[in-house]
Amino acid sequence: MAAERGARRLLSTPSFWLYCLLLLGRRAPGAAAARSGSAPQSPGASIRTFTPFYFLVEPVDTLSVRGSSVILNCSAYSEPSPKIEWKKDGTFLNLVSDDRRQLLPDGSLFISNVVHSKHNKPDEGYYQCVATVESLGTIISRTAKLIVAGLPRFTSQPEPSSVYAGNNAILNCEVNADLVPFVRWEQNRQPLLLDDRVIKLPSGMLVISNATEGDGGLYRCVVESGGPPKYSDEVELKVLPDPEVISDLVFLKQPSPLVRVIGQDVVLPCVASGLPTPTIKWMKNEEALDTESSERLVLLAGGSLEISDVTEDDAGTYFCIADNGNETIEAQAELTVQAQPEFLKQPTNIYAHESMDIVFECEVTGKPTPTVKWVKNGDMVIPSDYFKIVKEHNLQVLGLVKSDEGFYQCIAENDVGNAQAGAQLIILEHAPATTGPLPSAPRDVVASLVSTRFIKLTWRTPASDPHGDNLTYSVFYTKEGIARERVENTSHPGEMQVTIQNLMPATVYIFRVMAQNKHGSGESSAPLRVETQPEVQLPGPAPNLRAYAASPTSITVTWETPVSGNGEIQNYKLYYMEKGTDKEQDVDVSSHSYTINGLKKYTEYSFRVVAYNKHGPGVSTPDVAVRTLSDVPSAAPQNLSLEVRNSKSIMIHWQPPAPATQNGQITGYKIRYRKASRKSDVTETLVSGTQLSQLIEGLDRGTEYNFRVAALTINGTGPATDWLSAETFESDLDETRVPEVPSSLHVRPLVTSIVVSWTPPENQNIVVRGYAIGYGIGSPHAQTIKVDYKQRYYTIENLDPSSHYVITLKAFNNVGEGIPLYESAVTRPHTDTSEVDLFVINAPYTPVPDPTPMMPPVGVQASILSHDTIRITWADNSLPKHQKITDSRYYTVRWKTNIPANTKYKNANATTLSYLVTGLKPNTLYEFSVMVTKGRRSSTWSMTAHGTTFELVPTSPPKDVTVVSKEGKPKTIIVNWQPPSEANGKITGYIIYYSTDVNAEIHDWVIEPVVGNRLTHQIQELTLDTPYYFKIQARNSKGMGPMSEAVQFRTPKADSSDKMPNDQASGSGGKGSRLPDLGSDYKPPMSGSNSPHGSPTSPLDSNMLLVIIVSVGVITIVVVVIIAVFCTRRTTSHQKKKRAACKSVNGSHKYKGNSKDVKPPDLWIHHERLELKPIDKSPDPNPIMTDTPIPRNSQDITPVDNSMDSNIHQRRNSYRGHESEDSMSTLAGRRGMRPKMMMPFDSQPPQPVISAHPIHSLDNPHHHFHSSSLASPARSHLYHPGSPWPIGTSMSLSDRANSTESVRNTPSTDTMPASSSQTCCTDHQDPEGATSSSYLASSQEEDSGQSLPTAHVRPSHPLKSFAVPAIPPPGPPTYDPALPSTPLLSQQALNHHIHSVKTASIGTLGRSRPPMPVVVPSAPEVQETTRMLEDSESSYEPDELTKEMAHLEGLMKDLNAITTA
């Protein structure tokens, strides 16, 4: 409080604020905030002080028992008093409705009647106290673990034992780790009193040193954990008199690795037994420990070492050395000391303004190294661009905003515990402006230098202060689209430039600059948008990477500086990985070499190096592999066994040490053997490293020998196996025949076991290598057990009570098994009191090892059952033919998938010849293999079997759904997506749903199917300036997956210049009139509502509008005059020809022939590019044919089916067989198909011969028929039987005079509206309504029976001239690969062979038009050509020009009306 009062007095001093103003620009961004106590505010502003808010008491880890009560303490201090809540496992507890949990007045949590069972553990877990002050913030306490002791379970029972007087003895009692504190011992059913000679180790084990007669008796272990006591087996400890002979020195209990926390006590157990009685000494890291003079080190009974108040210096390797004068043995263990997290520097309270950068400091220590996380007002702080963890543990907040205010806590956690420390952040308001003048906005703010990670800004002084020597400046900047703004101040007054550092490459930033004077901050400059450059300056690979082994556990790696460093190399990152694993580790290095320690011995590692400069990581070097040096083996050979061959030899068998413990190439084995009697000489024999057995000969008859084996590498000898004994025969016995029957067999049944005893065969001259015991209910062949030849009794365990068992006993040797001896017994009922069979206590048992190696399972098969289940079956050749398992063998099944790569195997054990593998992934290939294990021996893995699970419907929607507008086409959008992350099979298709109402039923959405190999789709003809919602659903062979979340997209606004060409190109016809096509350069006036991006635009000036109207009128008058002059110059001869042709009734093909010189005017289409050409009569008898392809669009060519309605339904919501580069569709086409027409033309504009015809009125509907079925649209050329050139026709119809049947058999088209112009020859029309379109065909085409494709013409702009066809878009024609071009005859060829006619439907203004077929007939014979040439003499009606001019006048009036509107 004194510091606060001093801060207030300081803040009220004007000189202080002048000094702060001068230093404002000198502050670094991260240090621009005031630390606890001083608030950097201007005079007059209210000062907020920091509020004390902290925990007085925090909960700690607690151990409880079932049924008891427990209190977790918690108390917090604040003014006003905080509200206390509790979290369990991260979730708030509802204490209002909880009967067993209640909140105490001080904030502690009281839990009554703790519940804990095997399947219900509601009280055990992690608890956290949360304190909240409504107007201040929230803090959370450390996390405390509540452990509830489980039900007492003995993992190890005490066993009967005997001890010589004066020696040491132990009795095991292993229970659950959490129940060890509740263990006690009883002797003869009375509590055992512990003293310096009789102690209980922390594990619960009882140690009796210097045993006396009084120590003998019955012992049992008792666990009392709140419920009824749990008793272990009661066993007898016998104290035998001192035999005064020498016995082996052995460890009864060896130390094991331990982990303790600083401040705890630890006991390193070590108990040895032998005669003479051994003494125990301890060493730490090869230094002897003085347990007599040290107060913290105590030698307990039996030799165990107790260390009190453990410190970090106590960590290390401890050696227990037992010595009895004749022999010395030692054991070692590692003690690891851990430390709870502790704060070296705690975060402090901070004052700051908005847009400033601050740093909360937090420095912790602990072992293992703690992890640090930050919490703001009780919520986790997730690192981002503006919340960063710097210098390992500090929290940096960039660009403060008001919502950042509150309490921040640094929480440190490791395996031992956790701790928290917090601080408060207060965001201060800027001081109000004084009455003095403030500076205006700085001028000409520009980015003078733009780099990848920094931008330099410069500006001019404000206009209000041209000199600006006393002005300071603040630059505010933020990422585009981010509301959080940061500030950078100039370093001294008058400086007009600043460099913004630590920016992201290729990122857009928004900058603004404000000037400050002594009165306050002025106006802000206009925002400046600048994009940083992309990152390209990264280091190259480090050359000359080398690695060499420095020791068995370390490797040194060296390298050089990259040639292309692109700047100063800041550091290197060295990556290394053990061969055969997928876990790569890394270490930061500042030099050009590094030695990695703690590696595995004789193991291969790979290394690579990546250089870092200020831009980031560079290119990695190639991997370099090296192996650590070899060392002596760290483990003994495995599976040592002895086989007595005769009276003078014994065969030894063994297996190499485990691969991980060989530590190098095994170069040999050292065999040591001696007689079992004490003080006998040891003999050594060396064998090669590939040899796994050795025959030891020259032994004494009837003598017991001890054997042990050790492995060797070039570095030395590893540890040896334990001594194993075998006795040679008294004499060389016969092994040419099987042993005889054992002389006797006795059985003694118990409740769940049978004790079997026997005597050897009477004939002692035949070798007996062991006995085989068979037993089973009703049959002795169910189970078989083999025992050593010296064994005379055996206890068969795990039998059923009250069951009849048949038992057989056979002696065997290497020749085979002898004659069996049978016996039967009935186990006792379960109600009988179990008794200990004293006959078998301490009975030696030496099982005979199976001499044959284990064979792997065969015939492994994988049967697919479902999408996540596969059954694995196999056979075992080591079993009998009926494949019945009669021993304790088991099988291990392993499986994995190769997707993703380097996945690890999963394993499961089975006791049958099959296993059901569940929980697999759908549509995934797995490989399986099986291994058999019997005792300590295992086979190799079997051959692998493979199986792929069935598919399943996708369980996740398509991801990354994005919608963008297509450039240049505002009505077209492009939908992109990525496949589902859980496709569960091959994706066969997608369905896109879109609608303008996100809440509409899904069946009301428009759907767009897409094939499965596409990840993008175009949708056309959407409404402008309209929000659409899109969802995507994936499907595979099993069905549809879930839909993605709705993605909203608003189509852009477009002006009329954009709309006109788009509508025209897509053929979208609307009802009502349209604006005429005034050319691509014409742009009508736009209102503010039609401006792009929705921004209002200023309306056109009225004078400009008047000028446009007058100009259009003048141009129109000029065009009309030109057309009138052109038309009046037609010759009289041409008019006569028209009249004659109109009155002629010789031909049945009635159409308007195009005169050679007549060129009907076209007001909106450039007829210089494409005109109606007449047909010239050429006398050339050998015309030259040209093959001209017709450009087509697959969207506009639709095969004609039986009816037009069926065509429309086929196109609706279905896949298209042939799609263009981008899949396209229209919304209008989904609501109702708009008629489409396509008018293909020759790629050479002057070539096509086109005739335009009127559409019949509604009163006289005409029908177009096809005489045969349609051909496939994929056919490129159809050949006339009698013609040498390919022809491309839409259909073949005979002359109407020759065939009228074709007219009656064709399907009808849609009714045509009345044409705006009528033909002059109406009196010659077919009364039955035959079509007026021109058809040309030959009789040979009818006979051929070929069916040809029909193309539909898409209507062009409704105000285009009826006399001139639509001009295809400029540029080279595009061809659909599915619909190849059909050749047309050239103009010259047509003059001699055929009068080829294309028909186009011409409708009136504003009316919708159905599709009409475009007919390109084939070439007729010569005689047909002659007749057609005669028909071509047709000419116009005398009044035809008048009608055309009248029609043209109507169009002019429409244009004038639109222009003036």
Swiss-Prot record:
Start and end residues of each stretch annotated as Disordered: 1041-1097, 1138-1160, 1174-1206, 1235-1276, 1289-1381
Glycan attachment positions: N73, N210, N326, N470, N489, N639, N715, N909
Expression across tissues: Widely expressed and also in cancer cell lines.
GO biological process, one term: cell adhesion
Lineage: superkingdom: Eukaryota
GO cellular component: cell surface; glutamatergic synapse; Golgi apparatus; growth cone; intracellular vesicle; nucleoplasm; plasma membrane; plasma membrane protein complex
Molecular function, one GO term: co-receptor binding
Comp. bias regions, Polar residues: 1087-1097, 1191-1206, 1289-1322, 1330-1349
InterPro entries (alphabetical): FN3_dom, FN3_sf, Ig-like_dom, Ig-like_dom_sf, Ig-like_fold, Ig_I-set, Ig_sub, Ig_sub2
Bias-annotated ranges (Pro residues): 1366-1375
Modification type Phosphothreonine: residues: T1198, T1404
Xref: PROSITE patterns: FN3, IG_LIKE
Location of the Ig-like C2-type domain: 52-141, 152-238, 243-336, 341-426
Coiled-coil region: none
Modified residues (Phosphoserine): S1178, S1194, S1401, S1432, S1434, S1435
Ranges per topology, Cytoplasmic: 1127-1461
Primary site of residence: membrane
Keyword vocabulary terms for this entry: Cell adhesion, Cell membrane, Disulfide bond, Glycoprotein, Immunoglobulin domain, Membrane, Phosphoprotein, Repeat, Signal, Transmembrane, Transmembrane helix
Annotated S-S bridges: C74-C129, C173-C221, C270-C320, C362-C410
The Fibronectin type-III domain, residue ranges: 441-535, 541-631, 636-731, 741-831, 856-952, 957-1054
Family statement: Belongs to the immunoglobulin superfamily. DCC family.
Chain's role: Multi-functional cell surface receptor regulating cell adhesion in many diverse developmental processes, including neural tube and mammary gland formation, myogenesis and angiogenesis. Receptor for members of the BMP, netrin, and repulsive guidance molecule (RGM) families. Netrin-Neogenin interactions result in a chemoattractive axon guidance response and cell-cell adhesion, the interaction between NEO1/Neogenin and RGMa and RGMb induces a chemorepulsive response.
Domain notes: The Fibronectin repeats 5 and 6 mediate interaction with RGM family molecules.
Misc remark: Knockdown of NEO1 in C2C12 cells results in the enhancement of the BMP-2-induced processes of osteoblastic differentiation and phosphorylation of Smad1, Smad5, and Smad8. Conversely, overexpression suppresses these processes.
Full protein name: Neogenin
Species assigned in the record: Homo sapiens
Gene assigned in the entry: NEO1
